Amino acid sequence: MRKLAILGAVIFLLLLLGQWSGNQPERDATAAARAELGIAFEERFVDVGDVTLHVVFAGPENGPPVILLHGFPEFWYAWRGPAAVLARAGFRVVLPDQRGYNLSEKPAGLAAYRLDRLVGDIVGLVDALGYERVRLGAQDRGGAVAWRMAIEHPDRIERFAVVDASHPLASASADEDTISWYRTFMQIPWLPGYAARLGNWRLLASNLRATSAPGAFAEEEMDQFRSAWDRDGAIHTMGKWYRADAWPLESDGRVATPTLVILAENDRFIPAGFTRASLEFLDDGELLELGSGTHWVAGEEPERIGKILVDFFSRNAEWTAAPLGGTL
């Protein structure tokens, strides 16, 4: 009993210290992105049905719509660099904070974070903005949402590009296996969120920097992430994505939408075999191996990723993107 009491006291102190040490001031990521990139990012809240999402926009209102979905532990801000390239080319870029993240609504309960709800949010966003079809891009956990949307709502997607996220059935057909410690850790209720807060979010910040290219995630950028993680207990609702992960796929997983799968060379989270195996499920797909970059390549090489997306999203369209110059 004494050992249990000591253990309980240690856990309580850990939770208390984590809560205190992770407190952050409010920061305006939209204003920071405007100042950094010279793009007129604007923000508003959009009712998508079950929840209200915080959404940032860039580019001309009459441009072809592109929705970009962030992953864990990021938020819309992670896509700001490629979004600026797309906006300059004439696309209307839509950057939602997905449910449970940053300024978007954070419903209670685990069922609210099932994949069908997350997909429903993006379909609802397309409807709320008055679009019939969009070009869709995604990274990491945003890719899980985007893949399912491409499988189950192909009529809403014009073209689909995914970075560092494999098809949901690809792991079964690849010759690799992986055990992700952080996915296992995130299955534990509450504790990961408090542990993440310790030492000014040291666990998350150090993991991002250890798995990214040298120089990525500068301190100013990391401060924006810290504020997003702290806002209204977001770190806890972000974790619910992992605990509510299971949602059986009731089809063969075929994707008819033209799809570009982008593979970074040094992704330490998604095995390359999984990414390559994704092509087996595509009726009209292509694989682009970058030869550089990590799991966070959209932030490491924003100009390059942005130009790749401009090229892919402009294909077979009556609309022509504005010239950007440079090479991919």
Question: Language-model features: where?
Answer:
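Flexible "cap/lid" subdomain of the alpha/beta-hydrolase fold that forms the substrate-access gate
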Residues: L14-V55, P65, R92-V94, Y101-G137, ...
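Catalytic histidine-centered segment of alpha/beta-hydrolase-like enzymes
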Residues: G293-P302, G306
